[in-house]
Amino acid sequence: MKNKRRNFLKKSAAVGAGFFIVPRNVLGGNGFISPSDQLNIAAIGAGGKGNDITHEWASKERVIALCDVHPDGTHGVTDSRKTYPNANFYIDYREMLDQEKDLDAVTISTPDHTHGVIASNAMNRGLHVYVQKPLTHNIEEARMLTEIAAKNKVVTQMGNQGGSSQGVTKIQEWVDKKLIGKIHKIYAWTNRPVWPQGFDMKDMDEVKPPNLNWDLWLGPAESTKYTSQLHPFNWRGWWDYGTGALGDMGCHILDAPYKTLGLHYPTDVECSVGSVFEQAWSQNFVPKGCPASSIVTLNFDKTSKNDSKIEMVWMDGGLRPSHPDAIPADDFLGEVNSTNGVLMIGEKGVISCGVYALGPKLYRKGYETIEFSTNDYWNCL
């Protein structure tokens, strides 16, 4: 029988439509949750990030089921099964949803191309969902999930580590106080891909791991034979399964400027990509693979938080912006070694931070540099 807290979840979800966030202190009353008031959670995708997230949930809720297409796979699946020996284990998430009648919510930490179909299936059964970033594989799926969430009145959240970190809060404070004046340009970059990307997939005869259900791993994608070029981890570099460096890291890096400046849809977007050259002057076009590097320029109108049009430039594949005059030459851009970061450039100075908005710094001419230390990127709201 559903307890009071679970009923409250259902009622709170009816307040608004679409994807939104209900803070933990709301779900838990005054922050005191009795054992009988725990939610029954299942993890779909028990390795990698799924393993990490399950540990976070288990500190407050009850993990009653685990699901993974590779039951003895690496990247934490075995660890999850040992940590939660009383949780029922499934290979097919559909079987799990059919069997586990007492479920309240699921976490989804699977390859990008399966997020939409799994989340829609769960929400259509009245389950609340926590979906790892990126929310979906494409825009159409995101719109579909928004409609399904509203129809079924469920609580939803996308996992975006760093989304409510102290770094974001501090940058918001600096922006609101207009310490660097009107912001007119943003640079954001990552050292990703750190997986093979920009190449044609090789035709290799490989033996599928014995306990991997490859058909379930493929899910809605076209049937193809097993290859280690996809599983584990490397699926990120192929359009049929992942979203490349931008889709993998953009939400962690672009979140701070989007949130603090109140950005919405861009007015226009321009993209250029770099590719790998097979030999001298012979360019390698890879239609199914994400680019080896890219530069994406987005233009935004002024917002209520920033009275200036903004040009945002995203870079990946090892590309990054030139060193601004406002930042000392011996200082890193963004994070240590300048591997990932954000520069928000205004009339009076520059704000710099790393991925997850870690370690924000404020540089202003004639003033001492302000540095704010953070290490709380696991804040996900």
Predicted segments with their positions:
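Glycine-rich, aromatic-lined ligand/substrate-binding cores of catalytic
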Residues: 210-381
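A contiguous active-site-proximal alpha/beta segment in oxidoreductase catalytic domains
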Residues: 128, 136-211, 216
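Extracellular/periplasmic catalytic domains that process cell-envelope and extracellular macromolecules
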Residues: 34-36, 99-102, 124, 149-151, ...
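The substrate-binding groove and active-site-proximal loops of carbohydrate-active enzymes
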Residues: 132, 159, 243-246
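Structural recognition of the beta-strand scaffold that forms the well-ordered cores
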Residues: 40-44, 64-68, 107-108, 130-131, ...
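N-terminal glycine-/serine-/threonine-rich beta1-alpha1-beta2 phosphate-ribose binding loop
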Residues: 1-131, 140-155
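Short, solvent-exposed loop/turn elements at domain surfaces
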Residues: 49-53, 74-76, 99, 195-197, ...
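A structural signal for well-ordered alpha-helical segments within the folded catalytic domains
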Residues: 116, 120, 143, 165-169, ...
